[in-house]
Curated annotation (Swiss-Prot):
Disulfide bridge map: none
Assembly: Part of the 50S ribosomal subunit; part of the 5S rRNA/L5/L18/L25 subcomplex. Contacts the 5S rRNA. Binds to the 5S rRNA independently of L5 and L18.
Protein name per UniProt: Large ribosomal subunit protein bL25
Gene that produces this protein: rplY
A GO MF term: structural constituent of ribosome
InterPro entries documented for this protein: Rbsml_bL25/Gln-tRNA_synth_N, Ribosomal_bL25/Gln-tRNA_synth, Ribosomal_bL25_b-dom, Ribosomal_bL25_C, Ribosomal_bL25_long, Ribosomal_L25_dom, Ribosomal_uL5_bac-type
Keyword vocabulary terms for this entry: Ribonucleoprotein, Ribosomal protein, RNA-binding, rRNA-binding
A GO cellular component entry from the record: cytosolic large ribosomal subunit
Organism expressing this protein natively: Phocaeicola vulgatus (strain ATCC 8482 / DSM 1447 / JCM 5826 / CCUG 4940 / NBRC 14291 / NCTC 11154) (Bacteroides vulgatus)
Summary of the function given for this chain in its UniProt record: This is one of the proteins that binds to the 5S RNA in the ribosome where it forms part of the central protuberance.
Protein's UniProt keywords contain Lipid biosynthesis: no
Family, as annotated: Belongs to the bacterial ribosomal protein bL25 family. CTC subfamily.
Pfam families: Ribosomal_L25p, Ribosomal_TL5_C
Keyword Heme: no
């Protein structure tokens, strides 16, 4: 998995007025949930801010990254956990990061990449990707940049379900019956099948 560095500044004032002022100046309020726990057993949270520009390459991309967070000079390995967007302008309102514990598995969404020319496509069908990303659970250093699904032997009207896939070191979290991709019958393929059946 690729890594990306993001520089942030610790926030001392996290009130509404300060947050509004921060956003007005093209800053994004962020929270890092650490591996350390507080007295209630909850992850210790660090509030910090990042310039909007500094988040673009992380947010607006099909790729997944380990984030090297540089908060006032302190480097922490983290993953992007959640983003809130403005409902009208799509501006980034808030970002949550989780610090990586190298000894514990993390859950991430990994892009799916279809490989091969499906038999069903050669027969006139259309290949449709239903799930663009799959949720995986694994140690962060074994999570790939993408999950490759070989569709070469996929026939007309056939599907690939999550339960049919397996990757070394990864646990797939999605429902086993969820359809990842399918070769759908087109009008031309239906016509050809009807003609062949006569």
């Amino acid at each position: 998995m690729k890594s990306i560095e993001i520089k942030g500044t610790v926030r001392t004032d996290v009130g509404k007025k300060a947050t509004h002022e921060l956003r007005k100046n093209n800053g994004v309020p962020c929270v890092l949930y650490g591996v350390q726990k507080d007295e209630n057993g909850l992850p210790v949270a660090t509030h910090f801010s990042v310039p909007t520009e500094g988040l673009r390459n992380l947010v607006y991309t099909p790729h997944i990254y380990v984030v090297d967070l540089n908060i006032d000079g302190k480097i922490v390995n983290a993953i992007l956990k959640d983003i809130q967007f403005h409902p009208v302008t799509d501006a980034i309102l808030h970002v949550d990061f989780y610090q990586i514990d190298e000894a514990k598995p993390i859950v991430m969404e990994v892009p799916v990449q279809l490989e091969g020319l499906a038999e069903g496509v050669r027969a006139g069908g259309k290949l449709a990707l239903q799930l663009r990303k799959l949720k995986v659970k694994a140690l962060y250093n074994v999570i790939p940049e993408r999950l490759v699904v070989d569709v070469t032997s996929l026939g007309l009207g056939k599907t690939v379900k999550v339960g049919e896939l397996s990757y070394e070191g990864l646990e797939l979290i999605n429902a086993k019956e969820a359809v990842v991709c399918a070769v759908k019958l087109t009008r031309a393929a239906r016509g050809a099948a009807a003609t062949a059946g006569k």
